[in-house]
Amino acid sequence: MSGARLHTLLPELTTRQSVMVVGAAVIDVIADAYALPWRGCDIELKQQSVNVGGCALNIAVALKRLGIEAGNALPLGQGVWAEMIRNRMAKEGLISLIDNAEGDNGWCLALVEPDGERTFMSFSGVENQWNRQWLARLTVAPGSLLYFSGYQLASPCGELLVEWLEELQDVTPFIDFGPRIGDIPDALLARIMACRPLVSLNRQEAEIAAERFALSAEITTLGKQWQEKFAAPLIVRLDKEGAWYFSNDASGCIPAFPTQVVDTIGAGDSHAGGVLAGLASGLPLADAVLLGNAVASWVVGHRGGDCAPTREELLLAHKNV
């Protein structure tokens, strides 16, 4: 049933609502680890690859490959990492609205365990050095979808980004807090939620959010209480169990697409990219989440986080589903 619906939706993808992606482009050094290192140990890793990544770049690539045009505010610096990112973006037909900043882009080491779970160690660069001059370059049309990552919101520039968001008129923020949901100060988090964003959380992040907001950790009750407290949409991703969505209009669980998990790097980003592509095309939230599930299932079945599918690849992958 989901596959049939996906085949109906994919040809309809086109940019009907403007999208602005605000966030980071960084380098991911990905390595296999037989176990996570413990204090004082010395373990040998097997390098998989050195990829251009970052939450916002993963989403920009996913949108582009699905045929959605977006404005990409991904700060690029002047160092070796920045040049690698710039070249990678050019190959995807992408440019950044914030380019040639002083300093280099950041990078992270991703350790992938035998079961596919990943652990990140990150080093910040220009992507977390936002200032008012950069923000002044961005033109956000009324009615736009506006993506933010928790990595930037939890960084020292987070308050500046929220101030800018509060000044914008008639926009829909899409926020993927990621693992930084526990690091954002209470006062700033309250201001973010006052903007009534569409929030996407994975299972662990939903538990943290429930605790921070004094809500139930049971998913359906959490969704109901979230609507009562914030009057804003919520997505909770449950891996192979699918994804729940909650809004003032409807709620439900969209099943996951079957796949063989290779690694989970980029799973949340790709899901967000699929959802944004659906929303930008004017699809209802349920269909946008279905598209997010399809994109995420493709990504976790391939190594690395920069492997978002095209529409044609999704059609082929799910032709018999």
Swiss-Prot record:
* InterPro entries, alphabetized: Carboh/pur_kinase_PfkB_CS, PfkB_dom, Ribo/fructo_kinase, Ribokinase-like
The UniProt gene name for this protein comes to yegV
**What Pfam families does this protein's entry cite?**
PfkB (PF00294)
- The protein's Enzyme Commission number: 2.7.1.-
- Name the enzyme group at the top EC level: transferase
Which GO biological process annotations does it have? Answer: phosphate-containing compound metabolic process
Q: Which Gene3D superfamilies match?
A: 3.40.1190.20
Query: By its UniProt entry, which SUPFAM superfamilies does this protein fall under?
Result: Ribokinase-like (SSF53613)
> Hey, which family's this protein in?
Belongs to the carbohydrate kinase PfkB family.
Q: What is this protein called?
A: Uncharacterized sugar kinase YegV
Provenance organism: Escherichia coli (strain K12)
Which keywords accompany this UniProt record? Kinase, Transferase
